Each structure stands twice: as C-alpha cells, then as structure tokens.
Amino acid sequence: RATIKKGDITTANMISVHPYGNYLCSCYATGAEILDALEHSVANTQAVAAQDGKAVGESGGFLQVSGLKFTIDTSIPSSVKKDDKGLFVDVEGERKVKDVYVEKNGEWEPIDPEATYTVACHNYMLQDMGDGYTMFADNQYILDNVMLDNQVIITYICDFLGGNVGEEYSAPQGRITII
C-alpha cells in the first residue's frame, strides 16, 4: 500500500492506497463482537513509539475506527487466542482495550456488549475473515458488496467534501489512545 502526500489527490493515488479490490459491506454486530474485534486488532500493539509516531506492533489488520473511541493499555499482555491458521478464537484474560465508547446522536456512551450495532468495513475482514477477524463472518449483512473500497473514498471526497480534504483530516482525531 502507498501513502498520499499533501496536495492534489488523484484516482491513481486512491487505488494505490486501496489496491486489493475489496468491497464495502455493512452488518449487524453485538457490542461483544466489536470488543473482540478491537482486542484482536491491538493484540501486538506495544507502547514503544516508532519514528512515524505509530505504536510498534500495528499491522494492516489494525482497525481504523470512526464512531468509536477507546484506549489501548500496552502494559497488559495480549490474551487473544488464535488457531493454528492465525484466526481469532477468543479472549482469555484481561483485555488491553479499555474505555470503549460509541458515538450516538453526537454523544459518547459506553459500548454495551449485549446491544446490536451497525458495522461497516470491507468484505475482506467482515466476510472473508481477513487478518483473522472471525467474529463477523456469520452475521446478518445489511449491505453486501456495495462498491470498491477505493471508490467509496473517492465518492466521499468528491460528493461530500466537494473535492477538498480539509486540514481537520491531517491530524489524528483522538479516537484511539495508546498508553
């Protein structure tokens, strides 16, 4: 994958960032499934910061979220259990992910493990268990293979941002705190 430098963004830039041909999907998920996904996402995250400011241990499977905020406590060893193929099985022990909040009507409220939420992502993670995300594979899908992930971002930039990505997108939004 590539990164996008400051300046004009082209369709080729977007395709180089999202080159895999994944499709947007949306499903219903319980708060417990979301908590498991977050825990799986941060299993290898360590406190030591790399030169680019990201925590050591992040991978392509590290979830970038919207509508959620949470803290990763790197002093806690991962208790994520995976099978011999690297697929998520369970969390057996204390969780590294703490203080998970869901945005609802412009307010933040603690996630409810029993509640049902709507999750949007690409089919690779949600349906195909990519990067080991097994928790959503059998869920009920609201939207299935809507459009290519790079096309979703192109549409958002063109149709909702008027083709201008503002300064607010250049800095972290504070949704993920690493301690």
Go through each PLM region and give its residues.
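Catalytic centers of hydrolytic enzymes
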Residues: 1-179
